[in-house]
Structures are given as structure tokens and as C-alpha cells.
């Protein structure tokens, strides 16, 4: 009997220390991502937005993106921007600005990159976010992928590509944004399949949409006037 109690105690002790080690791992990894972000005060860049939705024909849009620490973020374009609200703000500090609990899950190969998989849970009920899973590069400590579930907006997935030139700041060269169409309100003038002479596809339209954003001409830490972020 005494031996069994000792065995149970040993198992509990191992579990306790394992949980603490994993918790410490997740905090350390996130702090390394934040350290990289401390190098960045502001940036602006040109972006090209490509929308891929089965039943919509949306032209590519050129725009400018602005970010200023700690949380100023804006996209400016003369064209029509169809961007889902939930999860779209990918400013460097947006993933860690809330009061969160983080848990290290595992190490995983993502494409050709070794990553740390970390789950993030907000610590208050008012948050629209339910859960985020982050794939963080084990060498460069940049975010390679994020999958987030929201209370009202379903699930969104962000996939990041980086050029070596801007890797120091954790700024992407390309972003793929995948989202649930059923949770997105579409403009009335987009009725779908309304191109003259175009035959309707027999296939059921996809339930997900994709937005690709290509970043060029970064200007980093040059200073940005706060007036840029004011609504006109």
C-alpha cells in the first residue's frame, strides 16, 4: 500500500514539474518574440491585396499600411477593401496585448521550419477571442502561423512568409489570411456568378475565403504623424 502511495505521489510530482516547465517554455518563447518587436517603433509599406472567393470576382487592390507603437494601425486605399474585421489586425503586438494564459503544446515542423506550438487563452470573458494557436519559429522567433477562433467570427488562419531583409523586425513579406465565409457579411452588390456569359460551376462554392497580402517598400522607424490614424 505504501509503495502504491509513493508511486502515485511520484507521478503527480512529475506531472507538476512538467506543467511548470511547459508553462515556463511558453513564456520564454513569447518574450523572445516580444524582444524582436521592441526594435520596431513604426512602419509603413505598400501592399497589394488579392481576394480569392469562389463566387466573387474582386479586383486586386493597392493600398498603404501604417503601424505605430503601441497599437495604432490603419490601411488606406482608394479602392474597395473587403477585409474581415476579426483577426485581421496583424500589427506586431496584437497577439499579446491582452491578459492571456499561454501553454506550450509541442515542437512541430511547419513546412521547412521547426516551430514551437503555443496556445493562448484570454483571461477575461469580455474578449471576442476564444483561443489562438501560434506556430513560432524556433530559431528566428517570428510567428509563422496563427489559428484563432472568435465568439462571433468563426475561425481565421494567418500564414506568414518573411524576407531576410525584414526578419529582424518580424515583418512579413507575404500574408495569407483564410476565413469562414459563413461568418462574413458581404456587400449587396456582390451577388456572385454575375459575370456576363460566364457559366455557373456545378461545384458547390467553398465555405472558406482567402486573402493574400504582399508587402513591399517598407519604411521602418522613420516616424509617422498621428494624424494618419485619425478617421476622415
Tell where the protein language model's regions lie, with residue ranges:
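Extended lipid/amphipathic-ligand handling interfaces
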Residues: 32, 63-68, 158-166
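N-terminal signal peptide c-region/cleavage motif recognized by signal peptidases
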Residues: 18-19
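Flexible, processing/modification-adjacent segments and terminal tails
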Residues: 24-29, 38-39, 47-49, 57-59, ...
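Bacterial N-terminal signal peptides that target proteins for export
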Residues: 1-9
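Gly/Pro-enriched, hydrophobic low-complexity segments
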Residues: 114-229
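Sequence/structural signature of outer-membrane beta-barrel proteins
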Residues: 52-54, 182
Amino acid at each position: 500500500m505504501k509503495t502504491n502511495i509513493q508511486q502515485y505521489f511520484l507521478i503527480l510530482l512529475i506531472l507538476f514539474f512538467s506543467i511548470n516547465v511547459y508553462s515556463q517554455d511558453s513564456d520564454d518563447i513569447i518574450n523572445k518574440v516580444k524582444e524582436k518587436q521592441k526594435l520596431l517603433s513604426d512602419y509603413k509599406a505598400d501592399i497589394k491585396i488579392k481576394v480569392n472567393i469562389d463566387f466573387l470576382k474582386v479586383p486586386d487592390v493597392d493600398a498603404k499600411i501604417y503601424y505605430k507603437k503601441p497599437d495604432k494601425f490603419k490601411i488606406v486605399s482608394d479602392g474597395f477593401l473587403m477585409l474581415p474585421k476579426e483577426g485581421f489586425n496583424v500589427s506586431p503586438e496584437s497577439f499579446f496585448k491582452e491578459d492571456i494564459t499561454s501553454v506550450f503544446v509541442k515542437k512541430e515542423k511547419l513546412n521547412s521550419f521547426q516551430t514551437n506550438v503555443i496556445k493562448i487563452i484570454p483571461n477575461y470573458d469580455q474578449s471576442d477571442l476564444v483561443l489562438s494557436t501560434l506556430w513560432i519559429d524556433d530559431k528566428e522567433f517570428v510567428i509563422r502561423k496563427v489559428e484563432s477562433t472568435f465568439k462571433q467570427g468563426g475561425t481565421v488562419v494567418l500564414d506568414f512568409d518573411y524576407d531576410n531583409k525584414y526578419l529582424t523586425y518580424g515583418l512579413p513579406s507575404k500574408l495569407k489570411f483564410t476565413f469562414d465565409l459563413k461568418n462574413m457579411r458581404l456587400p449587396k452588390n456582390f451577388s456572385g456568378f454575375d459575370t456576363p456569359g460566364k457559366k455557373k460551376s456545378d461545384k458547390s462554392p467553398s465555405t472558406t475565403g482567402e486573402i493574400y497580402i504582399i508587402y513591399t517598400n517598407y519604411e521602418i522607424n522613420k516616424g509617422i504623424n498621428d494624424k494618419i490614424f485619425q478617421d476622415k
